[in-house]
Every structure is written in C-alpha cells, then in structure tokens.
From Swiss-Prot:
The keyword Isomerase applies. It comes from Mycolicibacterium smegmatis (strain ATCC 700084 / mc(2)155). The lineage of its organism: Bacteria, Bacillati, Actinomycetota, Actinomycetes, Mycobacteriales. Transmembrane segments: none annotated. It holds the Pfam family Asp_Glu_race. Pathway: Cell wall biogenesis; peptidoglycan biosynthesis. This is Glutamate racemase. One of its GO terms (biological process) is peptidoglycan biosynthetic process.
Amino acid sequence: MSDRLAPIGIFDSGVGGLTVARAIIDQLPDEDIVYVGDTGNGPYGPLTIPQIRAHSLAIGDDLVSRGVKALVIACNTASSACLRDARERYSPVPVVEVILPAVRRAVAATRNGRIGVIGTQATIASGAYQDAFAAARDTEVFTVACPRFVDFVERGVTSGRQVLGLAEGYLEPLQLAEVDTLVLGCTHYPMLSGLIQLAMGDNVTLVSSAEETAKDLLRVLTELDLLRPHPDDPSVTAVRRFEATGDPEAFTALAARFLGPTLDGVRPVRRHAGAGR
C-alpha cells in the first residue's frame, strides 16, 4: 500500500513535458506527482548524447531517491539518449517514455503509410524514431529536425508570423513527401500545434505522445498494482509539485499558461551537473 501512495516522478528539459504532465493529471487525477523542468541545463537538443544522458540520469537519480513509484521521461531527446540506461539503473521502478506511444498512434492513424517525424537535432540524429517504426509494415518515415522550435516555446512565443515562417520552412520537405501523419517528436511542439497544422494543412493528422504516454502509465501502474486508491475523504486532493533547475519565476510564467490553476508555485532546485553512479 505504501508504494501506491508514492508520487510519480516526471522530468523534461524544460516546459515541454508539461503537456505530458497535463495528460497524466487528466487521466490519473488522484495521483501525486513531482515534475522537474531542467531549465538550468536545457534545452537538450543541441547537447551531445553523453551530456543529455548525464543530465537526465542525474534528475532520475534524484527523483528515484525521493521514492517515486514510477518515472516518466517526458522528453523525446532524453528518451532517445538514455531509456535503456534508465530502465536498468532504476529497476524495479518502472520507467515510461514518450517515443513508442507516439509511434503506435501514428501507425494507427496513417492512411497512406507516409509518416513524418519532427524533433530536436539530437532526437532525429539518434535514429530512435526510425528504429521504433522499423517493425511497422507498409510505412515510410520522413524525419526533419526543427531545432529552433524549442527556443520559441521556452520564451513563450507560440504564435506570430516569425514562428509560422519558420514552421513553413522546416515542414516543406514533409509536404513534398506527401505525409498524411506527422509525429510531434518533442513534447514542446504541441504548444505550436496550431501553427504546425496551419503549415501542413488540415488533411495531415498531428500526433502528440502526451495522451498516449499517460495511457501507458495507467496501464503500467494497473499491471503492477500501484494505482493510488481514490480517497474516501473528498477534501483530500492530489499533491502536485513543480520544480525548475533554472529561474523558477520564468518557468512559472510559462507553465501557468498550460496548467492554469493546477500550478501552485514552482520550487527552485539545484542544477543537476551529471550522474554520479
């Protein structure tokens, strides 16, 4: 029973993982969560794989040491860099990631088998999505790195002609490839979904991993009998803690736009320099 009452740990390089946190809150409203946005070290996209792995595992170490019952890597770049290491390192704590849920949804959604994937430089270069799609029959995958998208989202700029022009430039190869399904391979990108849809056209289905990741987490917690019991006392509500390794005020201003009243302040935490074990 004590494990059932433990919180769920979630982390991302910044605010992008809040799209995953929002879906988890919606689907698992009774669960306590601890979210860490690594704004002091992020964005992760331009970093090397060893740097991404070190930052990610340092945060994972911290969350697991605090007794989380599950760890959600709410970042495509981190998932592509350290998923295998994290699962070995933190076993028996289950680790849920964002790539496979998005792949499954895209395969189910496509009509012509031509699927686009956009992500950070590190995610696209890792080949993680290409590998994940390899088992899918009758699909052709086209990838494009969109490195500047994260910078705009982290600055709170999610609309305007400048961002639309950037999106049109990035996405032109995918339009020429006639993809009918586009995976938003970074948890920041759903915050630009309106612009991305406008650039791609209404006939293209956008796939975000947030809701599918929350479903995966629900499945894992159910299988391991780790779901938190619904409280008998209606005054007992879930505890949701949000932390940032960078400026907590800047993080709060951005996060409040996506979480609203769910967000009750952001705690500053020390910057994680790297994994030690």
